[in-house]
C-alpha cells in the first residue's frame, strides 16, 4: 500500500469501517436500537422529534394515516435491511444517545485512530465527520470512546439529513460550504469506494481506508492505507 500525505485544511471522516470496527455497529448498536424502536416511539409519542420521525416514516410509506404499529413495523424492517433512511437514523440516534448517556454503550475506535486525530488536530488540520448515522449519534459515539471524549477535536458533524446521500457529490460540496473550505483543500477518508468516488467528483482529495477484517476491500483509483498510522495529513 502507498503512504498518502495529503495537504488539507479539513479531514472529513467516515465512521463505520474507517474510524471504528463495523462489528461494533452491527453487533452492538444496531441490536440495542432495534429492541427499543417500538417502546421508544410509544413512550415518547409527545416528543416533537419523535412526532417528526413518525410523520417522515409515514411519508416514506406513502401512508399519511398509518397507525403507529405500522410505522414501528416499517422502522424495524428498515433496521433489519440496514436502510439508510432519515427517520430510522434519527430514531436510532435518539436511542443510542440515551444508551451512551446511561453508560450502556461505548464508542469503539481502532487503536490508531485517537492518536492520529489528536496529531492532525494539533498540526492545525480541522476535523469533521460524515456518517449515515445521525449527528446526535455521532457526537455520542465520539464522546464515549476508550480514549476519552474526542468531541472537542471536531469542527462539524454531518449525516444524510443535513448533507445528503454519501454517494452524491453534492453532499460533499454542501459540507465544504458549511465549513467554509474549498473542496480542493479537503480530504475524505472512507472504506467505501463509491463514497470516495463521490467526494473526488466534488473536488476532495481521498484516501481509502481498507482495514484487515473489514468488509470493504476495493480502493478503486484512490490511494489507500490499512491504518491511520500509515498516513499523515499536513495542514494546508
Swiss-Prot record:
GO terms for molecular function: 2,3-diketo-5-methylthiopentyl-1-phosphate enolase activity; 2-hydroxy-3-keto-5-methylthiopentenyl-1-phosphate phosphatase activity; acireductone synthase activity; magnesium ion binding. Gene3D superfamilies: 1.10.720.60, HAD superfamily/HAD-like. Belongs to the HAD-like hydrolase superfamily. MasA/MtnC family. It catalyses: 5-methylsulfanyl-2,3-dioxopentyl phosphate + H2O = 1,2-dihydroxy-5-(methylsulfanyl)pent-1-en-3-one + phosphate. It comes from the Bacteria. The lineage of its organism: Bacteria, Bacillati, Actinomycetota, Actinomycetes, Frankiales. This is Enolase-phosphatase E1. It comes from Frankia alni (strain DSM 45986 / CECT 9034 / ACN14a). Bifunctional enzyme that catalyzes the enolization of 2,3-diketo-5-methylthiopentyl-1-phosphate (DK-MTP-1-P) into the intermediate 2-hydroxy-3-keto-5-methylthiopentenyl-1-phosphate (HK-MTPenyl-1-P), which is then dephosphorylated to form the acireductone 1,2-dihydroxy-3-keto-5-methylthiopentene (DHK-MTPene). Monomer. Pathway: Amino-acid biosynthesis; L-methionine biosynthesis via salvage pathway; L-methionine from S-methyl-5-thio-alpha-D-ribose 1-phosphate: step 3/6; Amino-acid biosynthesis; L-methionine biosynthesis via salvage pathway; L-methionine from S-methyl-5-thio-alpha-D-ribose 1-phosphate: step 4/6.
Amino acid at each position: 500500500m502507498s503512504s498518502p500525505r495529503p495537504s488539507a485544511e479539513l479531514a472529513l471522516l467516515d465512521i463505520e469501517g474507517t474510524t471504528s470496527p463495523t462489528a461494533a455497529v452491527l453487533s452492538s448498536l444496531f441490536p440495542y436500537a432495534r429492541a427499543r424502536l417500538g417502546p421508544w416511539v410509544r413512550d415518547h409519542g409527545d416528543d416533537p422529534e419523535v412526532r417528526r420521525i413518525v410523520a417522515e416514516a409515514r411519508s416514506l410509506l406513502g401512508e399519511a394515516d398509518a397507525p403507529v404499529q405500522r410505522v414501528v413495523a416499517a422502522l424495524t424492517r428498515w433496521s433489519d435491511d440496514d436502510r439508510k433512511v432519515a427517520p430510522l437514523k434519527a430514531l436510532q440516534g435518539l436511542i443510542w444517545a440515551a444508551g451512551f448517556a446511561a453508560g450502556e454503550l461505548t464508542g469503539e475506535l481502532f487503536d490508531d485512530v485517537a492518536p492520529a486525530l489528536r496529531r492532525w488536530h494539533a498540526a492545525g488540520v480541522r476535523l469533521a465527520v460524515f456518517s449515515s448515522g445521525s449527528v446526535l449519534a455521532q457526537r455520542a459515539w465520539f464522546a464515549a470512546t476508550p480514549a476519552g471524549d474526542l468531541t472537542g477535536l471536531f469542527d462539524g458533524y454531518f449525516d444524510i439529513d443535513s448533507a445528503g446521500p454519501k454517494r452524491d457529490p453534492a453532499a460533499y460540496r454542501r459540507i465544504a460550504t458549511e465549513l467554509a473550505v474549498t473542496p480542493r483543500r479537503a480530504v475524505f477518508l472512507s472504506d467505501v469506494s463509491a463514497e470516495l468516488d463521490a467526494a473526488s467528483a466534488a473536488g476532495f482529495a481521498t484516501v481509502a481506508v481498507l482495514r484487515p477484517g473489514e468488509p470493504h476491500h476495493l480502493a478503486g483509483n484512490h490511494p489507500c492505507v490499512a491504518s491511520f498510522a500509515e498516513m499523515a495529513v499536513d495542514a494546508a
